[in-house]
Amino acid sequence: MNRFLIFCLPLLLPFSIVAQDNKEKPAVTYEELYDEPYSVNKLFIGFQPLYGELFATNANAGFGVEASYYYKDKLDFKAHFRKTYSSNFFDFNRQAALDNSDLDFTNKPQIFNYFELGGTYHIKDFDGAGKTKMVLYKKSLRGNKWAANVPLRAEVPCKVRKIYGVRLGGIHWKSTVDLNRALKEQGLTNADLVNNNGEGLLPINPITGAVRNVGVFSNLSTTNIYIGGSAAWFRNVAVSFEKYEEGLDDGLLTLFFDVIFAPGLTLDPVTYLGQDYSTNAVKTSSFGFRAGIDGKFNRTMSWSYGGEVGIRPSIAGQGFYMMFKIAFPVFGTNLDYKVESFGK
């Protein structure tokens, strides 16, 4: 009998914990303060102190600036710029060109920079019934007490604004390119880079007369057009909990997918000893796609996040990229500065 009890106790323990846990979770009451998913800021401007891009053409990281504008329930626009802080942090190919390029090559390594401007037309913009989960917080649980506590969450019904849209925009970016790697991946050599006389790029060692193994770099510039679709979910709800601090959910989340085409893609010739050597032998790809996420909050000052993954028009076989970005601070405003005035 004792052995049977010893065997059963471990099995009954989880049920006891669950029962105790449920007992310690009383229902909470709340009062709705507002639930207005259409009452969001019109303009958001954010500084991005850090972004990172794992790009097959050129891995890079740096800073950026981003702005979003919402025009009623019809359109929204987005502008974005980012660049590397320096070649050391972090512009991989540019730093490699500065470290390894021969003095006889006069191409100036290009700083990675990226510009984007686009808009979204709201095909369908509506709200519906939804739910959100809010953390129950007490001021008495500040500091170490809060860190040691497993927070409770309350499920609150709310309105959810849903936006299905069509996206259209343009992208322009520039970067240094490692031609040695591109040539090797495409089964080519420096001899395939030819000047006006049809002579290949074969630097000769004046002492030994042998062909020198040199680092060859160029600059790539692309102008892209993208078209795609997006889905967004906006919440803007606040409630007052009994015995807890107020709860808030003002998240603005957007998912998108774009097809990208580059009508303008230029790979600069290599300049060696004053002569230009054509890069036409290097294959490029003008098509790509991306999927991404953008998130921010409907506040006067907050932060935002985003990420993308896809194939970018670039050197053939070097288009894959993954990117993340974080913005802080992000300033939001509804651009409504009017006040009523009355004569005495």
Feature-to-residue mapping (PLM):
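Outer-membrane beta-barrel biogenesis signature
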Residues: 19-44, 128-159, 241-250, 333-344
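Short glycine/proline- and aromatic-enriched beta-strand/turn motifs that initiate or cap beta-hairpins
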Residues: 20-86, 90, 173-177, 329-331, ...
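Residues that define the transmembrane beta-barrel architecture of outer-membrane proteins
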Residues: 41-43, 57-63, 109-117, 162, ...
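Transmembrane beta-barrel strands of outer-membrane/channel proteins
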Residues: 43-51, 63-69, 79-85, 162-174, ...
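Glycine- and aromatic-enriched membrane insertion/assembly motifs of diderm outer-membrane
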Residues: 58-126, 224-226, 233, 259
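Repeated loop/turn-to-beta-strand initiation elements of outer-membrane beta-barrel proteins
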Residues: 73-79, 125-130, 238-239, 297-306, ...
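Outer-membrane beta-barrel "beta-signal"
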Residues: 116-129, 318-344
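Outer-membrane beta-barrel transmembrane domain signature
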Residues: 171-306, 311-317
